[in-house]
UniProtKB/Swiss-Prot annotation:
<keyword id="KW-0030">Aminoacyl-tRNA synthetase</keyword>
<dbReference type="GO" id="GO:0008270">
    <property type="term" value="F:zinc ion binding"/>
</dbReference>
<dbReference type="InterPro" id="IPR045462">
    <property type="entry name" value="aa-tRNA-synth_I_cd-bd"/>
</dbReference>
<comment type="similarity">
    <text>Belongs to the class-I aminoacyl-tRNA synthetase family. Glutamate--tRNA ligase type 1 subfamily.</text>
</comment>
<dbReference type="InterPro" id="IPR020751">
    <property type="entry name" value="aa-tRNA-synth_I_codon-bd_sub2"/>
</dbReference>
<keyword id="KW-0648">Protein biosynthesis</keyword>
<keyword id="KW-0963">Cytoplasm</keyword>
<dbReference type="GO" id="GO:0006424">
    <property type="term" value="P:glutamyl-tRNA aminoacylation"/>
</dbReference>
<comment type="subunit">
    <text>Monomer.</text>
</comment>
<dbReference type="InterPro" id="IPR033910">
    <property type="entry name" value="GluRS_core"/>
</dbReference>
<dbReference type="Pfam" id="PF00749">
    <property type="entry name" value="tRNA-synt_1c"/>
</dbReference>
<dbReference type="InterPro" id="IPR020061">
    <property type="entry name" value="Glu_tRNA_lig_a-bdl"/>
</dbReference>
<comment type="function">
    <text>Catalyzes the attachment of glutamate to tRNA(Glu) in a two-step reaction: glutamate is first activated by ATP to form Glu-AMP and then transferred to the acceptor end of tRNA(Glu).</text>
</comment>
<dbReference type="InterPro" id="IPR000924">
    <property type="entry name" value="Glu/Gln-tRNA-synth"/>
</dbReference>
<dbReference type="InterPro" id="IPR020752">
    <property type="entry name" value="Glu-tRNA-synth_I_codon-bd_sub1"/>
</dbReference>
<feature type="short sequence motif" description="'HIGH' region">
    <location>
        <begin position="8"/>
        <end position="18"/>
    </location>
</feature>
<dbReference type="GO" id="GO:0004818">
    <property type="term" value="F:glutamate-tRNA ligase activity"/>
</dbReference>
Amino acid sequence: MVRVRFAPSPTGFLHVGGARTALFNFLFARKEKGKFILRIEDTDLERSEREYEEKLMESLRWLGLLWDEGPDVGGDHGPYMQSERVEIYREHAERLVKEGKAYYVYAYPEEIEEMREKLLSEGKAPHYSQEMFEKFDTPERRREYEEKGLRPAVFFKMPRKDYVLNDVVKGEVVFKTGAIGDFVIMRSNGLPTYNFACVVDDMLMEITHVIRGDDHLSNTLRQLALYEAFEKAPPVFAHVSTILGPDGKKLSKRHGATSVEAFRDMGYLPEALVNYLALLGWSHPEGKELLTLEELISSFSLDRLSPNPAIFDPQKLKWMNGYYLRNMPIEKLAELAKPFFEKAGIKIIDEEYFKKVLEITKERVEVLSEFPEESRFFFEDPAPVEIPEEMKEVFSQLKEELQNVRWTMEEITPVFKKVLKQHGVKPKEFYMTLRRVLTGREEGPELVNIIPLLGKEIFLRRIERSLGG
């Protein structure tokens, strides 16, 4: 059975790059009738925060990427928090030491740093070996460690050989002998390094495929060597392309919003974000672009992942969001849009009126946060607009003639035509002025939609105010 995992570190909000990785894993698991596992890699004690764990899970749920096993739902391969698995890592490190594949190091971190700087100053690569650390392994140093309650670090003996990775996306990648030296797998604070914890977890959780960003490609050499040391076949690797900003540089905060939470707060829909992220580094067999989650699952395959960097285009995401927004049932749209109106200080009293406003304005909106300003004039009088002198009589007469008319465009339009003809006013100039009087804006939805919805009382009041009444 296919078993994949998404393993974020709770050091910040869920980045769109991480969300895309989670999405590809989720789609592959669902397509192959496998399991999608959430594992929290929280061994970086200084940067990990419980608050971010909750936020990460909240963002994944919002996107609809629900996991089969994880910290909150449990499973047969837990615990799913690395901080709760420390004893497991120690046992596996000790096993490697016993088998002669790893060794204890009694050097302090600053001594190791000194060695590193010395090697660099001599123009050598900072590669470590067991012989280099032997001078620190003395009875005095061991006693010191014991008295201070410290544990020796554990270093893995890197075999001197080539390793070959057959990556689903990158193809054959050869790691040459001597690319790296021995490396630390357990620190002196008793915590595992990323690569070691990752391999132990993937091994014990029976992960079959590792789908992750290609910034992890450099970690793969160490991981392949560790799988070999544990006499386990590595999973299938698929390193997906980097996401770049429109300027061709790695996507970062300088490009604007980059976290799922930020896009949600701006009024993007999960359907749109999922659809858009799926197309960053993957393509539909028939070139389709607008795809539901179900359609993405049924058409997803690893062989359509591209090795080329993907460009994050905010305008395309916005266009896609507009499509989903306009095609959403009005009840759902009203429910999602309401908080944005409240935040903008607009109180919704009449639900049916609110839905009609959304129907009229949604063609001009691409994200939920644009609704309040696009439709504020339906809820509040705009600042009075001065009517040009030559049109004051037109508006005064209209105000009188429309008092007793039934409020439908079928009844209102003939009155407009009659009054304009009497005064010889061009319709274009009149309607532009009328729009400004009613909405305070130069453009917006069609007046034939605005006028009936505003109602007679508001229509006449706004004309009265602009006439200086």
